[in-house]
């Protein structure tokens, strides 16, 4: 089998330890010293030359740091977590809906989704472009438009999409005491990807995407490396 590598567009933000909204910290150890303290390697300590760079790191990671995918377990006690969520809902064909003209707290309606003219099929991954990635790590980072509950129902109940993603930090009004869009998505086993970037670099409305989380049991959300695979003339 031959895998054709097309043009790759990076869709994840670069993360800097200690400078993110959610926890991200790295602690660095000498590998031999660190392994010597574990039961697995305590009897096999190696005195390596001092001029050899050989490190091991401990990572403190918030589950919602950077570009991340939220699983049903985020809102549903019986929902799937990172280790259980099927990858065929995070890898496949995606479509792009451009709502970059929308302002803070302005709703994206069902009719506006239809009026984009983009053909959305059952099993698609839907990306909503807001251009909020341009305000990443600024005081206005959360000044995002929102997806109406009617538009959400249209996507998950009438069409049957697999996943939804956005370059905003969310798709609901920030600070409210409930999250009906999240709950509707998760009830239909639809994961939600937040804080994507470079959606403005996608020239085609349909393309292939790969979004892979860590396979950690009980994890409600997980940072991902998301990429789009596009044809040469679609960049």
Question: Model segments located where?
Answer:
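Active-/binding-site microenvironments in catalytic and ligand-binding cores
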Residues: 1-235
């Amino acid at each position: 089998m031959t895998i054709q590598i097309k043009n790759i567009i990076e869709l994840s933000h670069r993360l800097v330890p200690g400078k993110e909204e959610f926890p991200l910290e790295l602690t660095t150890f000498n590998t031999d010293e660190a392994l010597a303290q574990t039961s697995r390697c305590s009897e096999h300590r190696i005195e390596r030359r001092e001029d050899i760079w050989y490190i091991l790191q401990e990572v403190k990671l918030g589950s919602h740091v950077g570009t991340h995918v939220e699983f049903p377990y985020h809102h549903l006690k019986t929902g799937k977590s990172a280790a259980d969520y099927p990858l065929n809902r995070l890898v496949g064909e995606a479509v792009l809906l451009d709502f970059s003209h929308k302002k803070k707290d302005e709703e994206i309606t069902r009719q506006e989704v239809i009026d984009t003219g983009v053909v959305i099929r059952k099993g698609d991954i839907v990306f909503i472009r807001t251009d909020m990635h341009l305000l990443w790590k600024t005081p206005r980072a959360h000044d995002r438009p929102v997806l109406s509950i009617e538009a959400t129902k249209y996507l998950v109940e009438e069409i049957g999409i697999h996943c939804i993603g956005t370059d905003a930090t969310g798709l609901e009004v920030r600070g409210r005491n409930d999250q009906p869009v999240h709950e509707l998505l998760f009830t239909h086993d639809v994961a939600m990807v937040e804080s994507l970037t470079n959606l403005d670099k996608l020239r085609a409305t349909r393309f292939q995407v790969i979004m892979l989380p860590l396979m950690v049991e009980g994890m409600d959300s997980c940072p991902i490396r998301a990429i789009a695979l596009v044809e040469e003339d679609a960049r």
